[in-house]
């Protein structure tokens, strides 16, 4: 998550010279779309990569751009903190609607709390931002995964499992 520049493009070209089959994406190239010279180059970036693009953007803007032929991936589209994964199905309905959509990645897999024993009732206790007296911290922002620090699933993982299920059954011509 940084800016995009000619140096990034040179690095992408170098990667392609080493391995022409290697997929290259970089989300921050969108910050300079329309810049001269054009650095959002299909020769160096194989996919259009966005973070948190809305389903409306995907359907109404990305697909409407007739010059853009690359596939689209949400390199980050859902933040698993708290009740964050609540809109996965909406995204996947759009993703399944067009072969140019490649899916998306959830931020992030695991909470980063530090095990600190058990509570009096026997439940695991985890330390996080500020619990060690540090003056600068991100509070509970490190507890934003699909699983707890002990890898027990959050409800968000159960939703993702359902949305990512390998088989979907839909009714077709139900009146016949």
Where are these regions (language model features)?
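Extended substrate-binding grooves/exosites of carbohydrate-active enzymes
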Residues: 1-175
